[in-house]
């Protein structure tokens, strides 16, 4: 509720900043909107916390399904409402965002979650160094960071590349981003089942391959079809890497440790996304679309190295490439 209130304030002030042409207020407003994003990312952990052990993986995946609806509604509203207020392009879009925040509040008012018990509040915790040095935690965080880093880099630069470098229309860019978001969240219908059956490591590898294919298509051409198909693959690759990483993280902490572990995980993952988003604009405007895609490759390289290290360290112990087993690392 607190995060939603901050987000609503940010959306309202963003609309005002556009109307009055105040760039610094706009930056502050978007910062507030981003705070809501930080709160909203905890929904997946909340779902995992209340799910049974067997259902945790699917719970995380199912939370992501809401993004499919958002993938169609968000870009459509942004496009249709951007000229709602004369001489203030996109101010109307931000006013519509306030309506979404009201809907969030109404849903949260009807949601009942168990309060933290004594085990969570007073249970024994391990030293932070011991928690964060677990191989499973390290590989989970690095995989999610890589997936988000590539996604943020390429996705953020796409509208600029399409409209400025490739001379496509804004409507084309909105169409591509719309389907990218669908690619991000549509796999949620089956990602959880795949992870439950095969384990997270093979699914992370699949996500990496999808990202590599995305980059290859982007380097091959700049038609709308290239952008459209590559951004769908980018979204799917992100989903596989992010959901699998989250699944691995929730296996690395006790109830008393979950707050700090979840917080550190999200700080690292979304910190990477923030840095990638900033770099995307700089690289795109100074070096171009090809450089954006080539700059994404090191993220995937880090994830591959981390996974091979984890496999060689734990393959015999956990049977990583077999059907998923209940184990800890």
What are these language model-derived features?
Residues 23-25, 53, 62-109:
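Helix-loop-helix hairpin linking two adjacent transmembrane segments in secondary transporters
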Residues 30-65:
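Cytoplasmic helix-loop-helix junction between adjacent transmembrane helices
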Residues 156-176:
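Short amphipathic helix-loop junctions that connect adjacent transmembrane helices
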Residues 98-118, 306-311:
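C-terminal membrane-cytosol helix-exit motif in multi-pass small-molecule transporters
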Residues 23-38, 226-240:
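Hydrophobic core of transmembrane alpha-helices in multi-pass small-molecule transporters
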Residues 113-141, 325-329:
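Juxtamembrane intracellular "pre-TM" segments in multi-pass secondary transporters
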Residues 186-200, 284:
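Helix-to-loop junctions at the C-terminal end of transmembrane segments
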Residues 5-20, 210-222:
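C-terminal ends and interior cores of transmembrane alpha-helices
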């Amino acid at each position: 509720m607190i995060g939603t209130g901050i987000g609503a304030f940010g959306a309202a002030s963003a609309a005002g900043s556009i109307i009055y042409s105040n760039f610094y207020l706009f930056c502050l407003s978007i910062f507030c909107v981003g705070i809501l994003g930080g709160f909203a990312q905890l929904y997946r952990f909340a779902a995992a916390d209340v799910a049974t052990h067997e259902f945790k993986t699917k719970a995380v995946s199912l939370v992501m399904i809401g993004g499919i609806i958002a993938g169609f509604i968000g870009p459509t509203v942004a496009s249709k409402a951007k000229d709602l207020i004369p001489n203030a392009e996109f101010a109307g879009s931000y006013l519509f965002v306030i309506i979404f925040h009201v809907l969030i509040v109404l849903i949260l008012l009807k949601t009942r979650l168990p309060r933290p018990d004594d085990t969570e509040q007073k249970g024994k915790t391990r030293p932070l160094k011991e928690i964060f040095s677990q191989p499973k935690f390290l590989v989970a965080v690095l995989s999610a960071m890589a997936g988000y880093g590539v996604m943020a880099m390429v996705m953020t630069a796409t509208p600029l590349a399409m409209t400025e470098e490739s001379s496509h229309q804004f409507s084309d860019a909105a169409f591509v981003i719309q389907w990218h978001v669908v690619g991000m969240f549509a796999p949620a219908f089956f990602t959880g089942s795949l992870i439950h059956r095969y384990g997270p490591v093979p699914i992370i590898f699949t996500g990496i391959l999808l990202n590599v294919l995305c980059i290859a298509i982007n380097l091959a051409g700049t038609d709308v079809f290239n952008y459209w198909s590559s951004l769908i693959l980018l979204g799917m690759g992100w989903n596989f890497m992010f959901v699998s990483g989250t699944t691995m993280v929730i296996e690395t902490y006790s109830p008393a440790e979950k707050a700090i572990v979840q917080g550190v995980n999200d700080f690292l993952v979304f910190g990477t996304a923030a840095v990638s988003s900033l770099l995307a604009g700089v690289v795109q405007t100074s070096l171009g679309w090809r450089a954006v895609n080539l700059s994404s490759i090191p993220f995937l390289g880090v994830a591959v190295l981390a996974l091979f290290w984890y496999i060689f360290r734990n393959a015999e112990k956990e049977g990583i490439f077999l059907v998923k087993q209940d184990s800890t690392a």
